[in-house]
């Protein structure tokens, strides 16, 4: 089965369609399908000869859509479980075969805005989640909602409190400037590499904007391990190419936005 996406401001359902007879299951473990991130499925059961005969297997309603929300998520399917995010950024797990709800994680930020006092909720979509596994007993999901990166137990749906502060990281922090009142998000899932989750940064495209740096966090502790500055800092490669050396110190310089890595 190939990936699917729903692009509707008022979508309240996710619909999965299966062929009646499928062979051995093929998982969709990354936002891009696999570690190569090539958005490709090797499944061949569905083609132009039988696509017209497909029937809906089940339907799931998230129950939280309104005229201001949208859903752009590309779900993961791992070990028979589907993981996705609702219009109001609730993370949920379903039995991929039946559509039965297993658990729902609510980040507890109703009508959340990434920048305090600014109506950016309409921009706060979440396009998917990242999955990390270290043995049978350590399975983690990472996803962003309202300017925070959350770490959730993939089996129980509970936040892993040893990660960051009570299971989340404030993405407004560790940018080198005070971005507490600026729009900061990470709408595309981070990339898992060994014990790191590497996330891009989405910022406002206006004068008052936070830096759009790329950051890597320890998947266990939430500690930032490194940062790539989209405008080179003194001593970094490429800094010498900037004619205006004071550019890096501008508080509200609109830096490149990195949606994904």
Model-flagged regions — what are they?
Residues 2-12:
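Bacterial N-terminal signal peptides that target proteins for export
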Residues 25-66, 100-118, 158-179, 223-230, ...:
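Aromatic (tryptophan-biased) beta-strands that constitute blades/sheets of beta-rich domains
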Residues 44-47, 51-132, 143, 149-154, ...:
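N-terminal cofactor/phosphate-binding cores enriched in small/glycine residues
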Residues 79-80, 138-139, 195:
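Short coil/turn segments that connect the beta-strands within blades of beta-propeller domains
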Residues 115-117, 121-131, 145-149, 154-191, ...:
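Asp-box/WD-like beta-propeller blade repeats and closely related beta-sheet repeat scaffolds
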Residues 212-223:
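Beta-propeller blade signature
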Residues 251-257:
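Conserved small/polar residues in nucleotide/adenosyl-binding loops
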């Amino acid at each position: 089965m190939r990936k699917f996406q729903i692009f509707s401001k008022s979508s309240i359902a996710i619909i999965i369609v299966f062929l009646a007879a499928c062979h051995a299951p093929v998982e969709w473990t990354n936002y891009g399908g696999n570690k190569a991130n090539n958005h490709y499925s090797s499944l061949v059961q569905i083609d132009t000869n039988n696509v017209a005969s497909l029937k809906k297997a089940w339907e799931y309603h998230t129950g939280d859509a309104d005229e201001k929300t949208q859903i752009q998520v590309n779900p993961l399917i791992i070990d028979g479980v589907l993981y996705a995010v609702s219009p109001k950024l609730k993370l949920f797990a379903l039995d991929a075969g039946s559509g039965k709800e297993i658990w729902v994680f609510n980040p507890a930020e109703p009508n959340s805005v990434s920048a305090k006092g600014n109506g950016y909720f309409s921009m706060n979509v979440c396009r998917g989640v990242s999955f990390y596994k270290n043995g049978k007993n350590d399975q983690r999901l990472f996803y962003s909602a309202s300017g925070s990166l959350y770490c959730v137990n993939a089996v129980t749906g509970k936040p892993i409190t040893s990660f960051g502060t009570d299971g989340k990281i404030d993405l407004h922090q560790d940018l080198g400037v005070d971005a507490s009142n600026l729009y900061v998000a990470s709408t595309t899932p981070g990339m898992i590499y060994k014990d790191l989750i590497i996330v891009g940064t989405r910022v406002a495209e206006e004068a008052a904007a936070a830096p759009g740096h790329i950051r890597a966090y320890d998947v266990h502790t939430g500690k930032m391990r490194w940062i790539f500055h989209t405008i080179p800092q003194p001593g970094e490669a490429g800094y010498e190419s900037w004619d205006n050396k004071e550019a890096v110190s501008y508080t509200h310089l609109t830096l490149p936005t990195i949606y994904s890595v």
